[in-house]
Structures are given as C-alpha cells and as structure tokens.
Amino acid sequence: MKIRNLDLTRNPINEEHRRLGLPPVEEPVSHPGTHPFLRAAVWFTALVLIALTLFLMGRLFLPNNWAGGLQIIGETLNGSVFWSAVAVGFFAQVVDGALGMAYGVTATTFLLATGASPAVASASVHIAEIFTTGVSGISHTKFGNVNKQLFVRLLVPGILGAALGAVLVTQVDGAMFKPFVSAYLLLLGIYILSKAFRQLRLRTQAPKHVGKLALFGGFVDAAGGGGWGPVVTTTLVSSGNDPRTTIGSVNFAEFFLAFASAAVFALLMETNTWPIIAGLVFGGLFAAPFAAFLCKKLHAKTLLILVGTLICALSLYNLYRALAA
C-alpha cells in the first residue's frame, strides 16, 4: 500500500467525505503551493498563453497591417457566428470547469451543426481549449483543487493519446467511435449517480491504471472532438476518488493535451474557422475562474449528482445522434 499524507482533522469537508465514504482530503492538495512541479506547470501554462497571444496578434497586425487587422476584427465582431460561439464557449467552459467534462462535446455539437467536418470541429475546439483549459487549470491550482500525484500520472499518457487521436481523425472519420464511447459513458453516469445515494467504500490507495485510462481518454478526445473529461473524470470518480481534486487534476492536465493535439492539427490540416475559435476562447475565458470557484464551493454529493446526471444526458443524446446518422 502506498503511504499518503492525509489530512485527518475534523473539518466540514472531511466530515462530508466521511458520510459519503470518500477519502479524506490530502495534505498536498490543501497546500498546492508547496509543490515545485505544480508551480512550474502553472508558470509554463501562463507563458504558453502569453506567447500564443503575442504570436496571434503578430500574425494579425504585422508587418504594417494595422488597417487590415482592425477590419478583420470589426467583421468578426459584427458576425453572428462569433457571438454564438461566445455563448457556447461560456456555457461549455462553466460545465467543463466545474464538472471536469463536456466542453468538447458541447462545443463540437455546435460546430457540427454549422456544417463543419469532424476533423475541423475537433481542431477548432482543441485550439480554443489551449486558452480555456489553461486559465481554468491555473484557477484550479490556486483554489487547491489539483492533486499533484494524479496530475503527473495523467500527463504523458494523455498527451500521447491526444496526439495519436489527432493524427487518426485527420485521416479517418472520428464519428465512428461515438456509439461505443457514448454507451460506455452512459453506464458510468448511472454508476456515479448510484454512488451519491449509498455508502461508498473508503479508498486510501492511489487510483490504478491511470496511465491506460489517460491514453484512451486523450485518444477519444482528439479523435471524436470530446471525451477527455467524461472518460477520465467519470472513471476516476466512479472508482470512489474525491470529485473535487479529481476534477481539478483532470482539468489542468487537459491544457497539455489540447496543446499537443492542436499542434498536430496545425501540422496536418488547415482551418479557416478563426471567428468560431475566437468566440469559444472569449466566452471561455470569462467562465473559467467562476467554474473553478464553483467547484471549490459545491458539496461532494452535489458534484456527484451533477456529474452523473450530465454524463447520462449527454451520453443518451450522443448515442441517439450516432445511431440515427
């Protein structure tokens, strides 16, 4: 058995965890700033966001293209596509940041409804997710929602799976994976709902097979346009792990997956959906800090119910769409 530094004090959070049969809060999670690795990950994320913003601004306005850049911005702001994407981006990021899932599913559904191909939809969502998951991940870390050990175990396999999925979806239609993934998620959603209403078994061991789970989750996320949160978060939460720290860790790891898959998409295909990407980013940036705060304040049982209900509803909807196609 792996020895873990648990906070066993009698505080409101641990009392609720005891009633639900969830693990006690871990001391490293309560004090995330003491971990150099998490601090380095936060700084890397912030630097990537700044560098990408400067790069895109340079592509828009340089060299000596201020008039053309302002014209493009004006046309984008006056278009209905941009503001529709803003609304979708805000809603999708609130759901994803607070529950750890469904940003890709929500946003991809919108893009597919506009006529975009699965490859273009997935590319647009993952490029936008670089910004939204970056801000959300930093917020989760600051609120103490990230478990360093779990985050590290998710990182490399998840990145590898996302890169492989991005390569596949540019060659084969990723929609063929949807029926199988949706059926799997529906069963997990039902299982999570049952956990919220019965005594859970206390777990003190680290979750098993996290690397394999992250590899699969990253793959279906890039190939199908969404699924990292539903696959990884629901599996870990349904195994009896703390919803708050699981959501925060999975959400922060998603930034690095989005960065890797977006790089592969940029190399293998061209996309002209920048107004949609800009709208998703703009809406998501406003929602990310609010979602992390919501995750911090909601009770564990409430999170279990919300996660289970959301997964069941989305899985039924996606399964119906996939089978009716």
Go through the PLM ranges and name each one.
Residues A40-W43, W83, A123, M176-A183, ...:
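Alpha-helical transmembrane segments of integral membrane proteins
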Residues M1-T45, T53-E75:
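Intrinsically disordered, low-complexity non-transmembrane regions of multi-pass membrane transporters
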Residues I3-P23, L70-E75, F82-G158, V210-A223, ...:
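Small-residue-rich hydrophobic segments that form or flank transmembrane alpha-helices
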Residues L47-V48, G158-A163, G174-A196, L280-A292, ...:
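Selective transmembrane alpha-helices of multi-pass membrane proteins
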Residues I50, S124-A196:
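Membrane helix-loop-helix hairpins that form the core translocation module of multi-pass transporters
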Residues L52-W66, V135, K142, S182-Q205, ...:
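Transmembrane helix exit motif
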Residues L60-E75, V167-A175, F265-W274, A322-A325:
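Membrane-interface helix termini and inter-helical loops of multi-pass transporters
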Residues T53-M57, L164-L168, F219-G227, S261-V264, ...:
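Hydrophobic alpha-helical transmembrane segments in multi-pass integral membrane proteins
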